């Protein structure tokens, strides 16, 4: 009985190494995926905050497009995000709602998946709308 138990343990010695070799790439892929999803979520949150700050500035002051774009770039630069496009739509004087719209776009660079030779970018966009506060 003792001899068969010892031979069973010796015959299963390499199983842990083989199982680890099979599971490790999957663990790496999952951890890289979680990291990239977190980075994309953070970038989207930064774009939303930048659009919100820009539309706040445009809503409480006279809609000055260069000033709004500068404010949006300031928020994005603080978080090391490079916006590819900033669109400011001033309020229409004939519209009773007088809404101001700011849209910010950026390309998200996928970093971790370069191991799999995917070097693409994912376009992200955030839009904020507020009513212009004027008398």
Task: Show where each model-derived region lies.
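Alpha-helical assembly-interface signal, strongest on the long, hydrophobic N-terminal helix that forms
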Residues: 2-72
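Short, conserved structural patches
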Residues: 2-3, 52-135
